[in-house]
Amino acid sequence: MEEAKQKVVDFLNSKSGSKSKFYFNDFTDLFPDMKQREVKKILTALVNDEVLEYWSSGSTTMYGLKGAGKQAAAEHED
């Protein structure tokens, strides 16, 4: 699972200039051979490790690196 976690973090870092939040389906594309439930477990583990954070608009939940993006800057998060 550590290798999969690193793959997610590398993906997010490579996109940090354009986007800071991503849909769940963006991550399922990273792991085409895995079931959605397995991908969800990887993302949940990263959230629990405080590497990722959830962001919700009320109707949609997205994932991003903790402290990245305009929302974090507006809330003065580190």
From Swiss-Prot:
Disulfide bridge partners, by residue number: none
InterPro entries in the cross-refs: DsrD (IPR014793), WH-like_DNA-bd_sf (IPR036388), WH_DNA-bd_sf (IPR036390)
Described purpose of this protein according to its UniProt entry: May play an essential role in dissimilatory sulfite reduction.
Family per similarity comment: To A.fulgidus DsrD.
Name of the featured protein: Protein DsvD
Organism the protein comes from: Nitratidesulfovibrio vulgaris (strain ATCC 29579 / DSM 644 / CCUG 34227 / NCIMB 8303 / VKM B-1760 / Hildenborough)
